[in-house]
């Protein structure tokens, strides 16, 4: 889906998580009120900037052609990060409120992003999590995506008891879909699931808070 973007810096050697999409993105920050230290971040790739960048980051991991009809109003979220001392809920709530305002200001309707599950166990937890979620949170077929490098789910244990990672749980509570089977991101040793959240599907309990 467009030109390949090369990494601008090697995270393993620079200590920085940087790639070629960063320059095309808007960056949402939460700062601590006294020290002004950055304690929470999201990066946002808007539709017109995705076109300039040669496509969405997610297209490097998935065939997202079934989402093409959404692209004029679809933003991609990435690099969600909250400082370890501020992971009590307030910071992510502020980030989500900022995202909601961004979406409403620019009249965008859909958010997508790759939600990552660590694979230190070889992928069994990720396979079990997908198996657990697919019956209740899988997207309609018209929003389905297909991994270029699929996690080999059938070769893994799909029946382990798992706890859903907090960020994925938060997206699902808002009303997000899982758009298909996980991709294996060998560079970061994670299993990535493509998440889609239409603003129109946000749970009414949260819509009153975020969509004012």
Write out the residue ranges for each language-model feature.
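Long, contiguous binding/interaction regions
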Residues: 201, 207-208
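Active-site rim helix/loop that mediates acceptor-substrate recognition in acyltransferases
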Residues: 1-43
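Acyl-donor binding region in acyl/amide transferases
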Residues: 47-177, 182-192
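C-terminal "cap" of GNAT-fold acetyltransferases
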Residues: 188-202
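Short loop segments at secondary-structure junctions
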Residues: 33-35, 85-86, 199-202
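Short intrinsically disordered coil segments
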Residues: 59-60, 208-212
């Amino acid at each position: 889906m467009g030109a390949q973007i090369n990494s601008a810096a090697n995270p393993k050697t620079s200590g920085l998580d940087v790639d070629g999409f960063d320059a095309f993105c808007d960056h949402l920050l939460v700062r601590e009120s006294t020290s002004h230290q950055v304690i929470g971040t999201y990066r946002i790739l808007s539709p017109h900037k995705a076109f300039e960048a040669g496509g969405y980051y997610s297209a490097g991991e998935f065939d997202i052609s079934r989402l093409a009809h959404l692209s004029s109003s679809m933003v991609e979220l990435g690099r969600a990060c909250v400082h370890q001392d501020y992971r009590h809920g307030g910071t992510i709530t502020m980030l989500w409120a900022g995202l909601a305002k961004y979406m409403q200001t620019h009249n965008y309707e859909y958010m997508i992003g790759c939600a990552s599950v660590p694979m230190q166990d070889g992928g069994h937890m990720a396979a079990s999590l997908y198996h657990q979620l697919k019956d209740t949170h899988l997207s309609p077929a018209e929003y389905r995506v297909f991994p270029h490098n699929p996690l080999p789910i059938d070769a893994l244990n799909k029946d382990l008891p798992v706890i859903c990672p907090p960020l994925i749980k938060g997206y699902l509570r808002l009303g997000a879909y899982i758009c298909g089977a996980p991709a294996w991101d060998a560079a970061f040793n994670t299993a990535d699931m493509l998440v889609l959240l239409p603003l129109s599907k946000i749970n009414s309990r949260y819509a009153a808070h975020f969509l004012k």
